[in-house]
Amino acid sequence: MELNYWDGIMQSIAYLRSRYGWRVVIKDFVGFLGKESAIASSIGLCISHECEWCMKLKTHDALWERCQRGNMLLRNACARQRCWFIGNAWCGIPEFVFPVFYGDQVIGAVCIGGFPHDDERNRVRARRAVALAGSDPALLEHWKDTFTVSKADTQAMAAASGAIGAWLTLYYTQLKEFGIVREGEIYRANTAKLLTLSHAMAFIRSSWKEEIHAADIARFCHCSVSHLSHLFKKNLQRSITEVIEEERLTRAKRMLADTDMRVTDIAMACGFGDPNYFSFVFRRGSGMTPSAFRASIRKGRALP
């Protein structure tokens, strides 16, 4: 599948987030999305929940495992329901769920969160999750922050999820026609690979301002540094350090374009301890210095 196919889906998901405040997550129940390595840096980024509540909980081994078991429970619920429904995750997060089928097999789901639902029950679940994590009850404040819209617009959610689901079904169909997947089979290794990469990228996107080491990311993903490094090289064709620097440079370009901050301040804000190293990395990646990039943006000759 050509990358621009996934670019269209990613743009649609980004629009739904900016227009409606929805958090869209793609569930792959059979491992078909991990068949192409390029997907790890496109639709694969939508496999994990990135809200701070979920990110905090998943640092704990027991809750990480509970989260993975929840995916299987969700798959079973999708197979039973066979149409969209609103469900409550074990950690107190309500989601609009749109099952994706190929024939009679449920291959995935499009999940949309960000709205309150069944508040009392979900508050109890959230408190239980905090207790299981042995965390400060103040963590519950992050649970409240997950609600970015006042209510679920199920009609709009069904329309948007149906379109994304159709893209996913088409992709699965093409994989099947090329003999890359077989109907009814589950590719657990692909599921695990994409899940790890998605969580690693989520960690980088949420921690780019801080000093990040490969060991920190591996710890969050509950795997070894060597395993994570191998996944990055094989699927992203870049090292962990290179991906971290790319994320920081992307943020730096936005700051250069949208603010009047000094270059040295932007370097520090983006996690580069040495402004000279920041300028070196920036020039290596964009072919110009940060100051020249800012000037070109203001003259309309470059894009962030």
Please name every model-derived segment.
Residues 1-23, 108-185:
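Juxtadomain coupling helices with adjacent low-complexity linkers
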Residues 2-5, 10-92:
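Structured interaction and signal-relay segments at domain junctions
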Residues 70-126, 160-164:
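Sensory/regulatory domains in signal-transduction proteins
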Residues 171-202, 206, 214-221, 234-246:
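Short, Lys/Arg-enriched, Trp-marked, Pro/Gly-tolerant hinge/linker segments that flank
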Residues 198-212, 232, 236, 253-262, ...:
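Basic, amphipathic alpha-helical hairpins
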Residues 215-224, 228, 232, 266-273, ...:
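Append "Primarily bacterial transcriptional regulators
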Residues 234-274, 295-304:
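Terminal helix-turn-helix DNA-binding modules in bacterial transcription factors
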Residues 280-304:
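…primarily DNA-binding HTH/wHTH and HhH modules…
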